[in-house]
Amino acid sequence: MLRLAAFLRGMNLGRRRITNDDLRAHVEALGFTDVATFRASGNVILTAPDDGALEDAARRLATGLSEALAYDVPVFARSAEQVRAMAAFEPFSADELAASTGKPQVMLLVQAPKAAARRAALALAPADDLFVFEAKELHWLPSVGLSQTELDYKALAKAIGHATVRTKGTIELIAAKHFGG
């Protein structure tokens, strides 16, 4: 059995509203077990019914949820080990964290970007923001709150592909609560 976290993009934004109970029921109807949700922002912890690849579980979830909800549901899946690694990774120094009024963010990507895409993304970072790539994530320390950032999300998506964003604190809480991290 494969235990994983699925980070769903665009949940509970605009008109795309779903309760955690309904989301859990849809995921269980797709054959996943031990389903738990964390906050109302599309964080689902689950066990896949077989030991297939993580990508297979993500694809099955994305297809099934998109059909059930009648809108596209991009899924960014990570194994328990990957979630613990994201939570433990500390890309920013104490001084950098203290100098920022923004919260550390983790952008989950479908795949690790190639060198040219990384360079393009780094060039898009607003002044005083910090970007650090690690595996299939872009760790971001905005110098201001997200509502004030000058980051061009569309240009960033063009450079590195679509992503979903969670605070580092959310990743840490999921790791601690669901994966013994």
Describe the role of every protein-language-model region.
Residues 2-181:
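Surface-exposed, charge/polar-rich loops and edge strands
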